[in-house]
Curated annotation (Swiss-Prot):
Name of the protein described by the UniProt record: Uncharacterized lipoprotein YdiK
Subcellular location per the Swiss-Prot or TrEMBL entry: Cell membrane
Signal peptide: 1-15
Pfam family, any one: DUF4305
Lipid-anchored residues (N-palmitoyl cysteine): 16
GO cellular component: plasma membrane
Membrane topology: Lipid-anchor
Lipidation (S-diacylglycerol cysteine): 16
Transmembrane region(s): 34-56
Record key words, sorted: Cell membrane, Lipoprotein, Membrane, Palmitate, Signal, Transmembrane, Transmembrane helix
Length: 63
């Protein structure tokens, strides 16, 4: 379970869930709740991209 690709998929899925929750939150899009969820989503998606890049770097160094 230490594979960076698996963790990248998990972080990306959680980021998508946070994005969905922020988009479907009651009230306006500029409420504290929706902004907080979007911050969490951006963080998770950025971590997923870092995990995918790290996996590519590991595979490149193994050759």
């Amino acid at each position: 379970m230490r594979n960076p690709v698996v963790w990248g998929m998990i972080y990306f899925a959680v980021g998508c869930i946070f994005t969905y929750l922020a988009a479907s939150s009651p009230g306006s899009m500029w409420s504290f709740y929706s902004i907080l969820l979007m911050v969490f989503a951006a963080y998770n998606i950025s971590i997923s991209f870092k995990m995918f890049a790290f996996s590519f770097k590991i595979k490149k160094n193994q050759k």
